[in-house]
Swiss-Prot record:
Its EC number is 3.1.21.2. Keywords: DNA damage, DNA repair, Endonuclease, Hydrolase, Metal-binding, Nuclease, Zinc. This is Probable endonuclease 4. GO terms for biological process: base-excision repair. Endonuclease IV plays a role in DNA repair. It cleaves phosphodiester bonds at apurinic or apyrimidinic (AP) sites, generating a 3'-hydroxyl group and a 5'-terminal sugar phosphate. The gene is nfo. PANTHER family: APURINIC-APYRIMIDINIC ENDONUCLEASE, ENDONUCLEASE IV ENDODEOXYRIBONUCLEASE IV. The keyword tRNA processing does not apply. Zn(2+) 2 binds at residues 153, 187, 224, 269.
Amino acid sequence: MFILPPPQEALLGAHTSAAGGLHNALYEGRDIGATTVQLFTANQRQWKRRTLTQEMVDQFRIALNETSLSYIMSHAGYLNNPGAPNPEILEKTRVCMHQEIADCISLGISFVNFHPGAALSDSKESCLDRTIASFSQMAPLFENNPPLVVLLETTAGQGSLIGSSFEELAYLIQGIKAHIPIGVCLDTCHIFAAGYDISSVAGWEQVLKHFDAVIGLSFLRAIHLNDSVFALGKNKDRHAPIGEGCIGSDSFCFLMQDERTRMLPKYLETPGGPDLWTKEIRYLQKVC
């Protein structure tokens, strides 16, 4: 199984817009001073995906070369529920997962990020097992060892979502890792909302040690940088600009400096758009 090597530089970017073509997300990344980006490869709120054409692939790969961006991440659609108890939704999700991963391989994308799923009316234990089965079924796509890693995103713990605890993510990874390349994308707002106090250096030290003990730091492959509108442990997913929420700017400077996290690709998902991201990237690169 292919193991994607870590970056050779500290990569920082944002979730940019693919309006008018997937390649435009890369050019917007260049314009805001990013060295990597996250994007949607299809409409995130629809089941039906547009067909990826060779022209789209060529445009994207040309833009990759022209912008020198690397370790691009695709964020899978919001309708996906890999652990859905409803058989129809589960099948739709698995079809979308297959198409998403196949498109990422064609485009030369490094990471594809998924929300782990929601139990809804069923137990979380059953949801976790269905999620493992969903991702394990993607194994044939990786037979030729494409340089792509599937990431499970940490969740805020709202409702019946799974993936808000490191223990749940560890259970998923143990069940999936023999079948496909798998890792974790840590969302700072989400883990704070789920009760992990990362508002100080001391807090981060405890959280990273706990992550390493439960999951293993080798599985931490990327970070979503978001401050939080709501206080610690409120299980509410509401992003705030860096330094303007309940986490605070010192937490993000820690991530930019600490040897365990400095080289992990980082993606802003803060509200405000390109103008704010330009300022945040400059701040994180220069001030931190």
